[in-house]
Amino acid sequence: MTQRRRRRRARRGRFGRRAFLAGAGCAALAGAAVLLGRGQTASASSVPPTDEAEPNAALPSGEWRAVWVSYLEWAGMDFSSEEAFRAGAAELMDNCLSIGLNTVIAQVRPFGDALYRSTLFPWSHLCTGEQGQDPGFDPLDVLITEAHSRGLSLEAWVNPYRLRSSAKMPPALAENNLVNVHPEWVCAVGEGLYLNPAIPEAADYVVQGVAELVQNYAVDGIHFDDYFYPTTDAALDAAQFAASGAGDLAAWRRQNVTALVKAAHDAVKAADATLRFGVSPQGNPDNDLGQQYSDVKAWLAAEGENAVVDYLCPQIYWGCGYTLQSVSY
């Protein structure tokens, strides 16, 4: 057992077990979220959970108070040296502690890249300004050290399919970006570039990236964002759909996404059953189901060997009085 893993195991002992909990989340310290544990359901008016549900070793026993730290925040960090980045990371973690948080969800693969040493993905342009260029230190290792030294949990946040959000983000792609290595896996939606969710080899590669993270870093979990199918356009995966022989496009697409999420969950648990695997879907499950082909209710209900997620953290960016989004999980 590595020193990092021993340190993470010792710290995790302070959390305990429960299958359902509610907590606050925020993106750039704004917005709210409800955390739903596997096998449970909740609505905007949910009462505090009972202890009747079967315990889930991956979930804390108390509140899960988390913050999303996105690539937008990394753009404001100093990556010029390990010392400079560590100073910024220390300030970030101190700020999290000062407002009562206990978990940091750090975006480490925003564009098919890596803010860590990877054999699968190029270095993120956020580190040096150029995708593929080694910054000379490991930002994720620094983040983990600074978080754990303060008793904070750190989850690695991965965007599974997105490779480029526009022609300028990232500004240029490395030679070993999947756009260049496996162009047959890539689909374009507007100016964005994405892995095609209908191609199993592409999904397998994403899962390999998850395994690389949990095997090599003392993270406390893996967190997927809501970037699943990038469009409802039937042309996106028409060739794969025709070859599949499936009869219903929407159901088939949901199967593709669920297969990826399930495989990622299993890769996390294969490394350590106490690690968390969660997804942050859109706050409206109807949109998840019909627009991004993410059957989040089924994921939440699945248990045992069929488990898909430990938790969902819906992106609920509205108040209880906003009736257009008053839907329940």
Predicted regions and their residues:
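Glycine-rich, aromatic-flanked loop segments that form ligand/cofactor-binding clefts
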Residues: 66, 101-109, 139-186, 223
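Catalytic domains of carbohydrate-active enzymes, especially glycoside hydrolases
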Residues: 88-113
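Aromatic-lined substrate-binding rim segments of carbohydrate-active enzymes
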Residues: 110-158, 252-260
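Aromatic-lined carbohydrate-recognition surfaces of secreted/lumenal glycan-active proteins
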Residues: 155-159, 223-226, 253-290
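Aromatic- and acidic-residue-enriched segments that line the glycan-binding/catalytic groove
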Residues: 116-128, 162-189, 227-245
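N-terminal secretory signal peptides and thylakoid transit peptides that target proteins
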Residues: 6-27
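Active-site-adjacent "subsite" loops/lids of carbohydrate-active enzymes
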Residues: 62-64, 68-83, 161-212
